[in-house]
A protein has these predicted regions:
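Conserved protein-kinase N-lobe ATP-binding Lys motif
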Residues: 7-8
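Long, low-complexity, intrinsically disordered segments
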Residues: 175-188
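C-terminal helical cap(s) of enzyme catalytic domains, especially alpha/beta-barrels
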Residues: 136, 152-175
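The catalytic core of metal-dependent phosphodiesterases that act on cyclic dinucleotides
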Residues: 12, 21-97, 111-113, 117-151
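Short, conserved glycine- and acidic-residue-centered signature motifs
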Residues: 50, 102-107
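A conserved beta-strand->loop->alpha-helix hinge within the catalytic CA
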Residues: 15
Length: 188
């Protein structure tokens, strides 16, 4: 799935839905392979209009997500009234989840709440195996972040697509992190 983040200007463009419909037809793109993202701040504004646009986007077959959830514009009303498929939990909740029980409790509660709304939950900004372990414990659906890779050049990304190399690299990284945890220090 490729995510496309819509700007404020784009979401209010009266030709947006027609553009999406024509583009998927012209290039024979499966809309199920594309997720349309709106930031939380945008979704929390004109919820009735945003809800209308999201319904139109979904009617074309796209999935939709609310991005950066929890960074100051949190609106339970927005996730209640707008039919998003995915909620992306902001990195600020993940940064200290392994050392702060309050953060862990909050993340657990948000995951439970969002699952109750039949939405898929992704944690953004996951950087290490310890965070992954804690998030798995709370039934998180998926992660994104430096845990997998830092931003890459095209050639590096293409090399990552070789599944075996990717899995080998993650297994090696996880084993190193586990040894550090057991020893209580850093290992290079």
């Amino acid at each position: 799935v490729v995510s496309v983040n819509l700007s404020r200007r784009t979401i209010y463009d009266p030709g947006l839905i027609k553009f999406f419909a024509e583009t998927i037809q012209k290039y024979d793109v499966d809309p199920k392979s594309i997720e349309i993202e709106l930031t939380e701040s945008l979704a929390a504004q004109d919820t009735s209009f945003i809800s209308f646009v999201i319904r139109k986007i979904k009617s074309l077959g796209f999935s939709t997500s609310i991005d950066d959830f929890g960074i100051g514009y949190s609106s339970l009303s927005a996730i209640k009234n707008i039919d998003f498929d995915v909620l992306k939990l902001d990195k600020s909740f993940i940064d200290d989840v392994e050392v702060d029980k309050t953060s862990e409790s909050l993340v657990s509660s948000i995951i439970s709440l969002v699952h109750g709304l039949k939405m898929f939950v992704i944690a953004e900004g996951v950087e290490n195996p310890s965070q992954v372990s804690i998030l798995k414990k709370h039934d998180l659906d998926a992660i994104q972040g430096y845990y997998f890779a830092k931003p890459l050049e095209v050639s590096e990304f293409e090399a990552l697509l070789d599944h075996n190399k990717f899995e080998e690299a993650k297994t090696k990284e996880t084993k190193k992190a586990n040894r550090r945890t057991k020893k209580g220090g850093d290992e290079k």
